[in-house]
Amino acid sequence: MNKPIPNSLRTLPDDRGRFGEFGGRFVAETLMPLILELEAAYEAAKDDPDFMREFQYYLQHYVGRPSPLWFAERLTKELGGAKVYFKRDELNHTGAHKINNCIGQILLAKRMGKTRIIAETGAGQHGVATATVAALFGLPCIVYMGATDVERQQPNVFRMKLLGAEVRPVTSGASTLKDAMNEALRDWVANVRDTFYIIGTAAGPHPYPAMVRDFQSVIGVEARAQMMEAEGRLPDVAIAAIGGGSNAIGLFHAFLDEQVKLIGVEAAGRGLDSGEHAASLSRGRPGVLHGNRTYLLQDDDGQILEAHSISAGLDYPGIGPEHSYLHDIGRVEYVSATDDEALAAFQLCCRTEGIIPALEPSHALAHVAKIAPGMDKESIILMNLCGRGDKDIFTVARHLGEQI
């Protein structure tokens, strides 16, 4: 007899890939057989102890997990309120959380007999992580990257090339992440037989949002255990930056059924009223993009608007569908931080903790800096420090008027 499904937020999506009214699979007819094949392969892999053992092996011995939980003592004193802990996923191999998902997906590609890897990238971190695992398993790799992002992320472009990947600049649209994803989907339609598309965020058609979340959920599982060891209890607040939303859902998933306040921080760019931001939950409305229904930045005619953020990893005009669902039911609070606030937080982290964060988690830190002073000293904030800032030093220098 089947056990009843517990009343849990962690059981979604449903069998159609839906999180409430969000998610699903809106893809070209030529892709549907492949999507169904991918779903079947993933469901089988998830239930295969050998696959999960192999995944854990690479996370431990190649990625370097578990990543540490760090009490940011000097930052805590400077802010003068709640204790601030960092989940330090920037210490992973390749410098961000992206590698967790790439390991899982390339093991699935290998299991399915696929011989060619494609990916999209914005900041370049997912591109680097995909090129890394493709090199590890000896598979050819093509990374689609908006021409605008190629210009502002030169170090990561060179890293991808060193790792043997071909980087294809995309010049359509605003030449950023949305456009790179469009090109990758076109490639996949044209090469369905031998190609595996490693999507970097918790978006795209089902099963990608659930699959990426599951591979990233190691972040929250580890952080939960580490928090219990360090403090004997769960945090009061867990905070993460939101672009497509994979690092955030990876952290949040372990806490969805707990009394932990969850906060996602979108990129407010030059301000929510400026029209130059990437805050699709704050300023968007539901629509369909890249195979799923979710909140999107769009005009009155339903045309997708260009997103802006100082952080190349956050300037996506949509959000993973699970975040849209969690927003609508009120389980997660979604706020935003501007370019200037993220820059200030970036510098604060460097100065107080000796850690150069990526501009993506600097948005989360900007919100930590807002709320921590108003909380008592026994309160605990857990923040996902999901990437290191080496890739961003040229951008930061330019904004600070420095020449490198």
UniProtKB/Swiss-Prot annotation:
InterPro entries per record: Trp_synth_b_CS (IPR006653), Trp_synth_beta (IPR006654), Trp_synth_beta/beta-like (IPR023026), TrpB-like_PALP (IPR001926), TrpB-like_PALP_sf (IPR036052)
Pathway annotation: Amino-acid biosynthesis; L-tryptophan biosynthesis; L-tryptophan from chorismate: step 5/5
Cofactor (UniProt): pyridoxal 5'-phosphate
UniProt GO molecular function: tryptophan synthase activity
Catalytic activity of the protein: (1S,2R)-1-C-(indol-3-yl)glycerol 3-phosphate + L-serine = D-glyceraldehyde 3-phosphate + L-tryptophan + H2O
Positions of modified residues (N6-(pyridoxal phosphate)lysine): 98
Disulfide topology: none
Entry keyword Repressor: no
Enzyme Commission (EC) number: 4.2.1.20
Entry annotated with the keyword tRNA processing: no
Coiled-coil segments on the chain, per record: none
Alphabetical keyword list: Amino-acid biosynthesis, Aromatic amino acid biosynthesis, Lyase, Pyridoxal phosphate, Tryptophan biosynthesis
A cellular component term, taken from the record's GO annotations: cytoplasm
Role this protein plays: The beta subunit is responsible for the synthesis of L-tryptophan from indole and L-serine.
Subunit and interaction comment: Tetramer of two alpha and two beta chains.
UniProt family annotation: Belongs to the TrpB family.
Protein name: Tryptophan synthase beta chain
Record gene name: trpB
